[in-house]
Amino acid sequence: MDSVKNILLEYGLRFQEPQIEKVDKYIEELLGVPYNLTAHRDLDSAVHKNVVEILLPLKEELKGTLLDVGSGNGVPGLILAIFFSKLKVVLLDSREKSVNFLRGVIEKLDLENVSVVKERAENFSKERREEFDYVTARAVARLNVLVEICTPALKTGGKLLFYKGPSYIEELKEAQRAMKELKVELEKVREYSLKTGERRALLILRKYESSPEKYPRRVGVPFKRPLL
């Protein structure tokens, strides 16, 4: 079975030994949790899905403040915090089970640049407007919903980093109204493939103006009545 280090080397990803040690501990914790928090039962699958998929499309150093919405098992936010030490990361999730897992992992990995908040994204974004340089999400919602619940917390000039699958083109078309309303524009799409055969895309959107105060709408509404 390949080690974390060997898998990252296969993709030409750069790392330092302390980072590998932390990822090893994280994967160990991840594989030990119940099925309803992660579907990965082996190291190879867990590293590809939770580490390689996150790092592979990133071409620049990330620094500043980053909010990870719907963090779940800590991806992408926790991985970005490990590999980009100049980031100050907030992991946001409304589920008690996820929050407890994340707090435990942060303590075991001795990560000083990460904190966890238990709250709905709609409430958090309204309370912490224009605070973050980056907002990330993966497997949380369709793009039009993400744009509404994430953008208000982003600084003007900041970037949304959304990890998507091959259906992102359809989601982009669907999200045009939300992007216009929330004042963000598509900066670039980085398509990439894993050696497992899976195709992925990192969508990078830039906020060019402050979002209207009426967004995000109250809890649940962006999901039930998305901007179309």
Swiss-Prot record:
Gene3D superfamilies: Vaccinia Virus protein VP39. GO terms for cellular component: cytosol. Belongs to the methyltransferase superfamily. RNA methyltransferase RsmG family. Specifically methylates the N7 position of a guanine in 16S rRNA. It is found in: Cytoplasm. It is an enzyme of class 2 (transferase). One of its GO terms (molecular function) is rRNA (guanine-N7-)-methyltransferase activity. It holds the Pfam family GidB. The gene is rsmG. This is Ribosomal RNA small subunit methyltransferase G. S-adenosyl-L-methionine binds at residues 70, 121-122, 138. HAMAP family: 16SrRNA_methyltr_G. Its EC number is 2.1.1.-. It comes from the Bacteria. Keywords: Cytoplasm, Methyltransferase, rRNA processing, S-adenosyl-L-methionine, Transferase.
